[in-house]
C-alpha cells in the first residue's frame, strides 16, 4: 500500500499538468466557437481535450488508496471540526476516484457495458461533497484566525491605552441615544470584518490559495450535475486557474494548507 501511495504521489505533477492543458483546451474551444473558427479546428481541440481527460484518468488509477491513507491520518486530528471535515473530504475523494476508475475502464474499452453517464454523475456528486467539506474547513480556519487576530488587536489597544472604534470612548456613531445610528454602526462593523478577513488571508497564503482553488473547482461539478449551468468558458477558466494553483503547491510545498 505504501509503495503504491508513493508511486501515486509521483504522478501528481503529470496529472495536474494534464489537467491544466485539458481546461485550457476547454477555454480555447469556447473562445474559438465564439469567434467563428472553422469546425475542423474546433473538432481537433475537442478531441485533444478528450484525450487529455482520458490520460488524466489513467494517471489517477489507484488514487483512492492515497485518499484513504489521508483519511486514516485525519482521523487522529485533535480538533473535532477539522477531523470531521478533512476525513469526510478524503473519503468522498476516494469514492470519486473509484468512480473515475470505472469510467476509465468504460472509455478505454475494458468494460464497454459501463453506463458512463451514470458513473460520471456519481463521480461528480462525490467530487462536489468533497469540495463542500474543503470549503467548510477553510471557513472554520478563517473564523479561528479572525478570532485570534481580533483578540490580539484588542490586547494591543488595551496595552496602548486606546479606545475601541465606535465605542462609548469615541462617542462615535451607533450609540444607543444616536437616532438612526444602527445602520452606520452595522456598516462600520462590516467594513472592519472585511478588513480583518483581508488581513488574515494576506497573512496566510496557503489558506488563501486553498479557498480560491476550492471555489474555482466548485463550478465544475455544479455545471456537470446541472445544478448551476455556467457554460464551458467559465468551467474552462476556473479549471485552469485551479490547476495552476495546484501546480504552485507542488512547486512550493509551503503553499499547501496543512494538515
Swiss-Prot record:
Region (Disordered): 157-176
TM ranges: 233-255
Coiled-coil stretches: none
GO biological process: peroxisome fission; peroxisome organization; regulation of peroxisome size; signal transduction
Lipid bilayer topology: Single-pass membrane protein
InterPro entries: PEX11 (IPR008733)
Name this polypeptide is given: Peroxisomal membrane protein 11B
Organism: Homo sapiens
Gene name of the encoded protein: PEX11B
Amino acid at each position: 500500500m505504501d509503495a503504491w501511495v508513493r508511486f501515486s504521489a509521483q504522478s501528481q505533477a503529470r496529472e495536474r499538468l494534464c489537467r491544466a492543458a485539458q481546461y485550457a483546451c476547454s477555454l480555447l474551444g469556447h473562445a474559438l466557437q465564439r469567434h467563428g473558427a472553422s469546425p475542423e479546428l474546433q473538432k481537433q481541440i475537442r478531441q485533444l481535450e478528450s484525450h487529455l481527460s482520458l490520460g488524466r484518468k489513467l494517471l489517477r488509477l489507484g488514487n483512492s488508496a492515497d485518499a484513504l491513507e489521508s483519511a486514516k491520518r485525519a482521523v487522529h486530528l485533535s480538533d473535532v471540526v477539522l477531523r470531521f471535515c478533512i476525513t469526510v473530504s478524503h473519503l468522498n475523494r476516494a469514492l470519486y476516484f473509484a468512480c473515475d476508475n470505472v469510467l476509465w475502464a468504460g472509455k478505454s474499452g475494458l468494460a464497454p457495458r459501463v453506463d458512463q453517464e451514470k458513473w460520471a454523475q456519481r463521480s461528480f456528486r462525490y467530487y462536489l461533497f468533497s469540495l463542500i467539506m474543503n470549503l467548510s474547513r477553510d471557513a472554520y480556519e478563517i473564523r479561528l484566525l479572525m478570532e485570534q487576530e481580533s483578540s490580539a488587536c484588542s490586547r494591543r489597544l488595551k496595552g496602548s491605552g486606546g479606545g475601541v472604534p465606535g465605542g462609548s470612548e469615541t462617542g462615535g456613531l451607533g450609540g444607543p441615544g444616536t437616532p438612526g445610528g444602527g445602520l452606520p454602526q452595522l456598516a462600520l462593523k462590516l467594513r472592519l470584518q472585511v478588513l480583518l478577513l483581508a488581513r488574515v488571508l494576506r497573512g496566510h497564503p496557503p489558506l488563501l490559495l486553498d479557498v480560491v482553488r476550492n471555489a474555482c473547482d466548485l463550478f465544475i461539478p455544479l455545471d456537470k450535475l446541472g445544478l448551476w449551468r455556467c457554460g464551458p468558458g467559465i468551467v474552462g477558466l476556473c479549471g485552469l486557474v485551479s490547476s495552476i494553483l495546484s501546480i504552485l503547491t507542488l512547486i512550493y510545498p509551503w503553499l499547501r494548507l496543512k494538515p
